[in-house]
Amino acid sequence: MSATGQSKRLAVPDIAARKGREPVAVLTAYTVSMARLLDPHVEVLLVGDSLGMVLYGFDSTLPVTLDMMIAHGAAVVRGSSRACVVVDMPWASYQEGREQAFRNAARILAETGCAAVKLEGGEEMAETVDFLVRRGIPVMGHVGLTPQAVNALGGYRARGRSDAEQAKILGDARAVAEAGAFALVVEGVVEPLARAVTEAVPCVTIGIGASAACDGQVLVSDDLLGLYGAFTPKFVRRYAELGPVIEEAAATYAADVRARRFPGTEHVFAARKAS
């Protein structure tokens, strides 16, 4: 604790040091209000490009822009004081080359105040990861089911069911880790492969639809809270069902308005009495 009584914000080295220790809890956040609610309870707040589907109604993450990620990343940093904030690099903001990746990653860090960026890809992105890390930009990698490559992968299906696919993903994980990533999201792979990746790489692994053996876990908060109804992946556990609660509150409010029960006298300002 600091002299002011506030806990210090967790930094990239704090997360990296959790390898093989107490698992790291990660949740997504896109707004100030959600960041404030989640911040005391998790080690990492991930501003994921999943916001494109959850907040904007896109059918994939591909339409998400750099400006969107920066706006939401800055909001989450402002709304938090403890968690390490990581911001996704959106599709086409880093794949062109390492110089493009550096320019956009540097802009994300400078304009949001976040601690690190996350990018998807395996061996083909190792050079870019190395380029960023050597220039002071911490990187969280992402292998396995990579949503930005959904068109090339042929949809959202579990990866690593064949020997060839397992070897490819394991090689991707090693390449990104050796390039200097401090953490690695392992998404949508068969459980034994996620366990093997965790054992093979020196960096923290964060599982999502992977394995309890990973060094941490991440979920999309709207999935966890029952707020995203488009579909529920197999790997999601709903810890609350807030959708019906919100619907009931809205319906009750609307009924009170129509019946003139709201606002009541306690919600309006009385005129001052003349002195």
From Swiss-Prot:
Protein name: 3-methyl-2-oxobutanoate hydroxymethyltransferase
Quaternary state and interactors: Homodecamer; pentamer of dimers.
Active-site annotation: E187 (proton acceptor)
A Pfam short name: Pantoate_transf
Cofactor or coenzyme needed: Mg(2+)
Major subcellular location class: cytoplasm
Keywords: Cytoplasm, Magnesium, Metal-binding, Pantothenate biosynthesis, Transferase
Residues given in the record as 3-methyl-2-oxobutanoate binding sites: D49, S50, D88, K118
HAMAP family: PanB
Gene behind the chain: panB
Stored SUPFAM superfamilies: Phosphoenolpyruvate/pyruvate domain
Assigned EC number: 2.1.2.11
GO cellular component: cytoplasm
Organism: Rhodospirillum centenum (strain ATCC 51521 / SW)
Enzyme class: transferase
Biological-process GO terms, alphabetical: pantothenate biosynthetic process
Catalytic activity annotation: 3-methyl-2-oxobutanoate + (6R)-5,10-methylene-5,6,7,8-tetrahydrofolate + H2O = 2-dehydropantoate + (6S)-5,6,7,8-tetrahydrofolate
Gene Ontology molecular function: any one: magnesium ion binding
Pathway: Cofactor biosynthesis; (R)-pantothenate biosynthesis; (R)-pantoate from 3-methyl-2-oxobutanoate: step 1/2
Location(s) in or outside the cell: Cytoplasm
UniProt binding sites for Mg(2+): D49, D88, E120
Keyword Magnesium: yes
Function: Catalyzes the reversible reaction in which hydroxymethyl group from 5,10-methylenetetrahydrofolate is transferred onto alpha-ketoisovalerate to form ketopantoate.
